[in-house]
Regions:
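Short coil turns that delineate tetratricopeptide repeat
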Residues: 5-7, 81-82, 117, 169-170, ...
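Canonical positions in the second alpha-helix
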Residues: 1, 76, 112, 164-165, ...
Length: 237
């Protein structure tokens, strides 16, 4: 197949899938938290002291085979640079491999965002032309992925990509809400409120901002602010 047409998209996708699948083996590991990489535990048992021990299933990669998968992805991208599905294929491979520390994934998505900003022609996804807002919507999904992984490094990636995207898509409140949620997780409620209020100034009916602002106000034990956001919630329900 490769000899007949070395640029064939299905062949290149098949090569990536072969190496990426072959690189992975499944293991069960114990972790102290009730979530790991955004997953619920596969099994919960008690230790000798009666404490819960949580077991999770995750994939371990063979570095050499994983490297072959990335080379296959790069070749697919080189021959089909307009195909977003190949770009996302590589980003997803980085996320799966890096787990709690998605540094390469973040850097790759930053470069893709920058490239998207310079493009004058439409992307494709598979054999179809991608909608104009496809990248914007997909990036919010990656924000959610970084958030869900739940490590300090992934949450920092969540903040950084959300900040970048909020500057590129100023009319989209989701990315500013993301930044507020980062600070809410850090228990910096004052800073979180700053971002939620920034959203509400432009989008007064945004329920995500209202609900999270109310949560921040409750943590601050600020009754006046609680009443303010409760009134906004009642108005928009």
């Amino acid at each position: 197949w490769a000899k007949a047409d070395s640029t064939n998209a299905k062949m290149l996708l098949g090569r990536f899938s072969y190496y990426f699948t072959k690189a992975q083996t499944t293991e069960v590991v114990s972790k102290p938290g009730k979530k790991y990489l955004g997953m619920e535990p596969l099994l919960t048992l008690k230790d000798s002291l009666g404490n819960d021990v949580y077991y999770y299933q995750h994939n371990v990669f063979d570095d050499e085979l994983y490297g072959q998968a990335i080379k296959a992805a790069d070749k697919a991208i080189a021959h089909h640079p307009d195909r977003l599905d190949f770009r996302f294929m590589k980003a997803n491979a980085y996320i799966a491999y890096e787990k709690e520390s998605p540094d390469m994934a973040l850097a790759y998505l930053f470069s893709l965002i920058d490239e998207d900003g310079k493009r004058s022609q439409a992307w494709s996804y598979g054999d179809e032309e991608a909608e104009p807002d496809f990248v914007e919507d997909a990036m919010q999904e990656y924000c959610y992925s970084f958030y869900s992984i739940g490590s300090d490094t992934s949450r920092e990636a969540f903040r950084r990509i959300s900040e970048k995207l909020s500057g590129i898509y100023p009319s989209n409140p989701e990315f500013v809400n993301n930044i507020g949620s980062y600070y809410l997780l850090k228990h910096d409620y004052k800073t979180a409120l700053k971002y939620y209020n920034k959203v509400l100034k432009k989008h007064p009916g945004d329920m995500t901002a209202i609900q999270n602002a109310l949560l921040a106000a409750k943590h601050m034990k600020n009754a006046k602010l609680e009443k303010k956001y409760q009134a906004m919630m009642a108005k928009n329900n």
